[in-house]
Amino acid sequence: LKASVITEKLDLTEREAQQFWPIYNAHEKETSAIRFEEIKSIRIEIRENIENMTDKKANELLKKLSKAENKMHKSRLEFANNLSGVLSPKKIILLKIAEDDFKKKMMAELRKRKKGRN
């Protein structure tokens, strides 16, 4: 679904698509690992232990979270740099718009489903 939204918005040529998708998929894999393995585990630990957490432990978790977020930022910068030789600047902007639109659409769908269950 996401791939079709991106493909439609970017109107990739065959050559662009052949170069773009491996870069995009590698980036998605990397950011998903950071988001779900690092950031999520830190947030779970914070939620489960916040009531009895010492300042020392809170500081440690803040540092871990900051490190993971910096890693995510670095990954995004590398991704944009890698795309610069494949897509025009306009298409890179269109990619960001397509991803944002997709997220909004998915969030709206989740809210709709959640509302339907209540």
Residues covered by each model-derived region:
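Amphipathic alpha-helical segments
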Residues: V5-V86
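Amphipathic, charged alpha-helical segments and their helix-to-coil junctions
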Residues: S4, K9, A26, H73-N118
